[in-house]
Amino acid sequence: MSRSIRSAIAAFALGAAFAPVAFADITIGVTLSATGPAASLGIPEKNTIELLPHTIGGEKIKWIVLDDGSDTTRAVTNTRKLISEDNADVIVGSTVTPNSLAMVDIVADAQVPMVSMAASARIVDPANPKTKWVFKVPQNDSLMADAIAKHMKAHGVKTLGYIGFNDAYGESWLAEIKRAAAANGLQVVADEKYNRNDTSVTGQVLKLVAANPDAILIGASGTPGATPQKELVARHYKGKIYQTHGVANPDFLRVCGADCDGTLLPIGPMLVFEQLPESNPVKKVAAKYITQYEAKYGKDSRTTFGGHAYDSFVLLEHAIPVALKAAQPGTKEFRAALRDALEKADVVGTHGVFVMTPQNHNGLDERAVVMITIDNGKWMLAK
């Protein structure tokens, strides 16, 4: 071998030794509800993901987004596919509580971290060992229920009625509002259920109105939350009407119309970031996200649900560079390192400050809640 060839080989080997390590793509698998009853929640999530970067920490991100049609079975099928066929390093989703709860066992058994965009605290219940692999970005129902009950008490409410979805979301909210009501000296005098796709709730509303509570809470999400609201107005109910943070999107305002004026609900502060003081920690992050979102999708197109998708990215943007120091994407070691990094996250999102711990895989506190009212079709901070 000639000296020139040996020199070339040596130079190549030396260059390779000091070249940056090339990792495989980081695969983020997403299942969300872009169609079906929860579409008004899932569409802004999907829209937000389309705005997100395709690199984190200098490494390429491969986004795979699937629609579960608001169906639990499809959410499970999507999750299995993303893990077994696409080798996802992390799962984001789903949009609603029943779907997310059904996904917990799958990701835990596969040891793939998951960031849910649904609300129920059951999704990250530390008493369930499977939730070691699960995190979520929306505020816990308990945090929001406390805000509602405190607002009711401060405004003279003594008795309340409840109507909510006949599923895990509605059941969770009924349990939480009963707990929060008792803690604030309020009495729940009636509770009713309905299905997300019901077109009439006349029977349930008549029972609620007959109980004559000072206020009624509707435990629903998306446009189906308008069904009992419109019926209550039609039946001339004169008390205060509260909704959950699950209805905070333009489609709900459009469907509910004037019947929702005066409605009260707890919400992440991002929705009304312009009305927040400069000292609020989320204002800067929320402004950046909403400015970008509305530049593409139109003025006042913001929703809290899009914010949940963005906050999922905020968490991953923090955790992925940490995990990359421990292992390469596409490996079980990387997924474990990513889970560990998520559990130590301390970051500011659009909804609040996420301070994760082994016992708290949501990490939000009272800074993630403001009470708002609907005033002539606009979201306004409540007094």
Model-predicted regions and their roles:
Residues 2-8, 12-14, 24-383:
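Extracytosolic ligand-binding ectodomains
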Residues 17-19:
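N-terminal signal peptide c-region/cleavage motif recognized by signal peptidases
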